[in-house]
Design a protein with these regions (language model features):
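A conserved ligand/cofactor-binding region detector
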Residues: 12-179
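Polybasic, lysine-rich low-complexity intrinsically disordered segments
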Residues: 4-5
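Flexible, polar/acidic helix-loop-strand segments at domain edges
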Residues: 1
Length: 179
């Protein structure tokens, strides 16, 4: 059912080079499910269906909008992991300074629509949701709550700093206070 595979990525690091590297799975003999990396609407639908059943313990016929939101979020996370691990591998292979930003709050806003846009699969997600009987992606996006990581302008400013660093491909990590 699963195909054994290695992922070859081209990552633009902070040195502005596009060097291919082989992103090996962490444990020999691990398997990567190709459906968890697929970007077409069928793969997104299959990922959502699998997360509804295996992660949330729901059938598609009894799934609420919140269940579909969670399933879509998990399916998007699966697809983001390839990029995340590729970034970590670039940093591991070419150690460089990392910016550490400390803030009492980060007001990052809803993330699902942003992640869909960054992956380029907004239309594919909407097509997958139509197969569940949801006519508009906005119906599911409205379910997402604002992460409670701040309450004002400084939190939004901290989030803007982090987004700018990411856009400039500067290795950065944000540290906050959990209260």
């Amino acid at each position: 059912m699963f195909k054994k595979m290695a992922i070859v990525c081209y990552m633009a690091n902070s040195m502005n080079t596009n060097e291919p590297f082989d992103l090996r799975l962490p444990t020999p003999g691990c398997y990567l499910d190709p459906e968890k990396a697929g970007m077409d609407s069928d793969a997104v639908f299959q990922g959502m269906t699998a997360h509804l059943f295996y992660t949330l313990g729901k059938l598609a016929t009894s799934a609420s909008p919140h269940d579909l939101y969670m399933a879509l979020s998990y399916a998007v996370k699966d697809r983001l992991m390839t990029r995340y691990l590729a970034s970590q591998e670039v940093i591991r292979k070419k150690p460089q300074k990392t910016v550490a930003y400390l803030s009492a709050e980060f007001l990052i806003g809803p993330q699902l629509s942003n992640n869909l846009l960054n992956l380029g699969i907004t239309q594919e997600a909407e097509d997958a949701l139509k197969r569940f009987g949801i006519e508009s992606l906005s119906t599911i996006l409205e379910v997402e709550e604002e992460p409670g990581l701040g309450n004002g302008g400084l939190g939004r400013l901290a989030a803007c700093y982090m987004e700018s660093l990411a856009s400039l491909q500067v290795p950065a990590v944000g540290y906050g206070i959990r209260y």
